[in-house]
Amino acid sequence: VRSSAASDVYKRQLLAPFTGAGQWMSGDNYGRVTSGTAVALLGRVRVLYASPLFNRSNDLSRWTQAYNDIKRSIDVLTAAGYGLANESNPGVNASGWANLFTEVPSQEAVFVTLHNTLTEGVPDYRKNNTWENGIRPYNARGGGGKTPSAMLVDMFPMSDGKIPATCETYNTLTKSDIPYYREFPFVDRDPRFYRTFAFPGVRWSFVGNPTTQGNRYPHNGPDYELWNYTWYTDAAYVDDIEANSSVTYGADGLLNDVKGFYVRKRSDDRDVNAIARYVYDEKSGGFTRSAAPYMEIRYAEVLLNYAEAACNAGEMGVAVDQLQKIRARVGYKAENNYGLEAGLDGDQAKCMAAIMYERQIELAYEGKRFDDMRRWMLFDGGI
């Protein structure tokens, strides 16, 4: 199966056409598979094959092959114009990073699925992205929102780039000296925290005006702020995270649809993306007609795959370089080593822990964590 998969990807690379710029970046061809897509996919396959799930004896030649193939793929991708989107413009609280998820075209989009805002017709060409509607709170005419796990909220880096001292995972990494208070989880965090989660007081602007639909919708879209404080009809349920919705009451019309934290990752935020990718329907549809793209492989994942292969092939310096690039894009500076602890290039175990940690943060809510857990056999406590 492995040889067949690699062979298919090589053929795809040879057959995939290049434009004058080296990739499909505009017009009707944007989103089509390129040779850059093919080599990036091959890199993912190589890392999977070298991982413990398929490599119980830790055959180092597999990691070396993955390292060499991904190194070559980066040359192809760079020549084709791919790279870290908005790399020189971190913005406020990683707004440049947040913009890459709705930007079209985007140099980050190595393997991208496009959507549209069409409604039902004959023939039916609808291909709406339902993510935006799913993550938006009910009082914005969204689907009600998605709730992040407390574990992920608690483990996001502090503003110095280090893991919180209270976190019980990644124990090989040096913990942050900045105090973390679970009662105030939004204080002094990694810039990406503020674009991955929404919490009380967050401005989460959108194009639309649901206020015409009654008191449950108190905010005009451009001025929307999330005030999701919760009251309980019975004090006995205050600390019960499984409390039934019948005993909770949310502010600002959220009522029993309230959540303590919301997933915000990949949101089409009006303050980040001036041109909304959705057609807002204040009466019934909310954000359901969204044309936001979905990136199955983005350039940051390629760099993280490269870092993982490099670390396990003994090239820890190369691995650390990739982590630094990803951290720099969201605003970390060289003077504090981009929030990374010193000496990662001399300690393979720490280097690998830093890579897996960065994958969990950078790629949160992009459908990658399950496969990372599986290929590293972490469901059973690791190897």
Question: Positions of the model-derived regions?
Answer:
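Acidic/polar-rich alpha-helix caps and helix-coil junctions
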Residues: 1-144, 160-383
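Extended substrate-binding grooves/exosites of carbohydrate-active enzymes
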Residues: 145-159
